[in-house]
Every structure is written in structure tokens, then in C-alpha cells.
């Protein structure tokens, strides 16, 4: 039976999330990365469900996740603080040893891109439970992934284009595959086409004779057939 992953694209709709370099909204980046992540998982024969596929408010995310009954769940987020802090961090449940393993696998693959590691972490609320609702209320082993700090120019450089958002998503997909013990299948390279713009000309020789009359006879035949022919 295929493994199942729930992908929560952080924020959305009226909730822009963090605001980064050039006024970029976290909600737009999380959606883009989540879509690329979904495509990567599909390529690896992993089933998935997304919390949202358009810019809509994040409604009933946990309920959707629990109804789907995934093997694991991942919430995609991006950080912001004071424009100086950098790095990726992955949160998991206080009460889940498996969560720590899962978080470590995902973080290691993000860090392999060159992002600074801020570690795998837990966060406790005043009641001694998990701080993040997504981690606290989700039945499956769940992570909240903070890919980088988008208000830091160096960190934002890891996600500032669609191509880089795809690279980030692929790193997360690798981490998921490693944890689920499923082979990660890289995207096949697109075939390239080449155009020959060479102006080089090639000559074709037909026949070689000791008797010039024989050469002239062949020349006449070639010209009669519509070919240019010279004797050298």
C-alpha cells in the first residue's frame, strides 16, 4: 500500500504570514513550495493531500489531515525576525521519538542546500503540551518546517525564484522519502535540442581518372543531371 503524506501550506488568504524581502508574503512561498513538494512525492509514488491549492484561508487544516489519515504530515513555513537571523529549523512533538527522527531527516536535506541549521526542536505551551496546533492535534507524526528566514537577504536567496522553491521542495521530499524508507526518484532531465549554425561547407568528389577525357565525360553527365561539376 502506498504511503500517504499530508502537506499543509502555511497561512493563506487573509493571513499573509511573515513578510520578507521586497514585501514578499510567506503564504505565497509556502503554497509554491508545497505544490512542488506534492509533485515530487507523486513522482516517488507517494500519495498526498494538500491543505490548500490556492490562496485561501487555512480552515480546518488539522481536521482535513486527520480525516485523510496520512502516515506523516508536514506543515511548510518560512520565518522572519530582525533581518539578521538565518537558518532552517524543524519542529516536532515533545512526545514523539519518531518525530525527532523525521525532523532530522528533513532538516539534514535542507541544510545540504547550504542553509544554516538551527536544529530540530520542540516547543512547549503553558500547559506542557506542544505549542503548535498542527503538531499538537494531528494524529500522524507531524512536523512544522521553517525553511529559512525570508526577511534575511542571504536566506531569501534560497527561495526567491520558482526554480529555487522547487529545489527546496525536492530537499524536503528527499527527507520524507528517507524517513519513510522509500526510494527518492529525481526528476528526469528535460531533453535538450541543438541547432547547427555552422557555415562550413563540404565538397563531394565523384571519380578519379588518369585520362582527362574520361573525367570530362563524367563532368558532362553530372552537369546534365543538374549538378555543378569541376575538374581539379
Map each language-model feature to its residues.
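Catalytic-site neighborhoods of secreted/periplasmic enzymes
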Residues: 13
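Solvent-exposed beta-strand motifs enriched in subsets of small alpha/beta binding domains
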Residues: 186-232
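Short, solvent-exposed mixed-charge patches
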Residues: 1-2, 232
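Extracellular repeat turn/loop positions enriched in glycine and acidic/polar residues, especially those
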Residues: 10
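A generic structural signal for short
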Residues: 25-26, 50, 94-95, 200, ...
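Active-site-proximal helix/loop segments of hydrolytic enzymes
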Residues: 3-4, 28-192
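Glycine- and acidic-residue-enriched helix-capping/strand-helix junction motifs
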Residues: 17-31
Amino acid at each position: 500500500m502506498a504511503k500517504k503524506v499530508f502537506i499543509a501550506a502555511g497561512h493563506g488568504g487573509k493571513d499573509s504570514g511573515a513578510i520578507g524581502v521586497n514585501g514578499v508574503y510567506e503564504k505565497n512561498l509556502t503554497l509554491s513550495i508545497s505544490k512542488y513538494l506534492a509533485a515530487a512525492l507523486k513522482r516517488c509514488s507517494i500519495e498526498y493531500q494538500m491543505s490548500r491549492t490556492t490562496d485561501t484561508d487555512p480552515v480546518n487544516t488539522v481536521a482535513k489531515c486527520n480525516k485523510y489519515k496520512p502516515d506523516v504530515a508536514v506543515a511548510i513555513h518560512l520565518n522572519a525576525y530582525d533581518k539578521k537571523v538565518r537558518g532552517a529549523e524543524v519542529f516536532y512533538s515533545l512526545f514523539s521519538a519518531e518525530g525527532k527522527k523525521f525532523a532530522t531527516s528533513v532538516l539534514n536535506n535542507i541544510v545540504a542546500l547550504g542553509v544554516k541549521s538551527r536544529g530540530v526542536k520542540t516547543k512547549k505551551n503553558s500547559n506542557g503540551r506542544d505549542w503548535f496546533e498542527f503538531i499538537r492535534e494531528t494524529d500522524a507524526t507531524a512536523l512544522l518546517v521553517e525553511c529559512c528566514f525570508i526577511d534575511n537577504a542571504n536566506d531569501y536567496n534560497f527561495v526567491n525564484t520558482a526554480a529555487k522553491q522547487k529545489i527546496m521542495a525536492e530537499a524536503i521530499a528527499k527527507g520524507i522519502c528517507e524517513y519513510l524508507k522509500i526510494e527518492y526518484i529525481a526528476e528526469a532531465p528535460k531533453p535538450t535540442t541543438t541547432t547547427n549554425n555552422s557555415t562550413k561547407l563540404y565538397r563531394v568528389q565523384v571519380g578519379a581518372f588518369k585520362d582527362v577525357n574520361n573525367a570530362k565525360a563524367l563532368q558532362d553527365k553530372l552537369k546534365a543531371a543538374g549538378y555543378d561539376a569541376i575538374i581539379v
